[in-house]
Amino acid sequence: MSKEEFMKIQTCVLKVNIHCDGCKQKVKKILQKIEGVFTTKIDSEQGKVTVSGSVDPSVLIKKLAKSGKHAEIWGAPKGNNNPNQSQMANQFKGMQIDHGKAGGGGGGNNNNNKKGQKNGGGGGGGGGGGNSNAPKMGQQLNPQHLQQLQQLQKMKGFQDLKLPPQLKGSVPVNKNQNQKGVKFDVPEDDDDDDFSDEFDDEFTDDDDDEFDDEFDDLPLPSNKMKPNMTMMPNAQQMMMNAQKNANLAGGPAKNGGKGAPAAGGGGAGGGKGAGGGAKGGPGNQNQGGGKNGGGGHPQDGKNGGGGGGPNAGKKGNGGGGPMAGGVSGGFRPMGGGGPQNMSMPMGGQMGMGGPMGNMPAVQGLPATGPGGAPQGYFQGAGIDPMQMQQQQQQQQYLAAVMNQQRAMGNERFQPMMYARPPPAVNYMPPNPHQYPNPHPYPYPYPYPYPPPYGNDQYSHAFSDENTSSCDIM
């Protein structure tokens, strides 16, 4: 081997995707077929392939890529005459990079203008590039070139490279070039600040100020009540109208029976002016005043009464209430005399007459269940006839029943944490024909109770282990 051939020998380290032994053998065969490859060493665990020879690493990468194996240059290759180094040097020969200064005098070597012009040094404030080899916008150093440049700095033969003086041993130039390579024409920080300030000023702050000024900071007027969150919006509006009408009772109406938004149909003698109608009384703001006209309220007028109160009685002939001519479910009849200051108590559950379609409740008393028994915490739970038949077999619950009875009678018990809810026991005369009851029907519970034992039903009734038998525990 001659000296020239020996000097051309170089060692190249490639990173190849090797998954198994088959991949290893395939890569080895491909590399051995290439001319100029002397030795090949493959580390399958790291995917590291070391090739020594006089072949260009780019040729190796192309051959492997054609066979479906992706290869990259790994680390710093050995040897001074590395074609990769000369390739990188050729890439940087045409680039003369300054420190990012946009020349004001249009120097001939200022090639890093932001638009990458190729016109010869024409002077002026723009600093046009005068070198014909100046890179365009897309030919500036990309991150891959920068990474290769950093690898060149770590190589052994970096001193022998024929690089421009700006690149030779000057790390700050490379850092500056890295900044120039990824920087956009428009400053990013200013855009981000302006963008965020724009949204903060136009949308966030203005919206908050607008809602704060119009809605949040305004106190409620004296004639308005705070909305009850458990009521329907219509009920709130009717209650607010009732309060306003009660405060305005006895005085002349401002707009008569037709002016208010919540006004009803108005009676035949509903007042239109300040003095009321021909037959009507003084007339309220939201009611139609006259003798035959029920006002614009759920509880309609009782033959007029001069429109004296918020709700003038029961026998209105017209009006826009939900149940015209009668008491709506759950609402108390409101008298016509005097300002009752929003006196509309809700009877039962939310003025709906009981939650399970029962009769409306009397004010002050709980709503009744379907069977006539007063309701407890479980609304609508009445007496179960099957539970009456089974009361003789629930003797082990008798002591708990004595302690859990309430003043209103047959109610279900409060739910315990671990105990099953026992059935409601009614103190009625036992049916002699049903004793003993052999369970003719299934239990009306989602999980049935265990049947009582024949002889030993009291030994485990209040046991510590049987937590489902005693509610006191």
Curated annotation (Swiss-Prot):
Protein's recorded name: Heavy metal-associated isoprenylated plant protein 32
Sequence similarity: Belongs to the HIPP family.
Binding, a metal cation: 20, 23
Lineage of the organism: Eukaryota, Viridiplantae, Streptophyta, Embryophyta, Tracheophyta
UniProt KW Lipoprotein keyword: yes
Molecular function terms, GO-annotated: metal ion binding
Ranges where the record places region Disordered: 96-139, 162-230, 246-343
Propeptide: 471-473
Naturally occurring in which organism (per UniProt): Arabidopsis thaliana (Mouse-ear cress)
Gene3D superfamilies in the cross-refs: 3.30.70.100
Described function: Heavy-metal-binding protein.
Keyword set, alphabetical order: Lipoprotein, Metal-binding, Methylation, Prenylation
Induction: Down-regulated by cadmium.
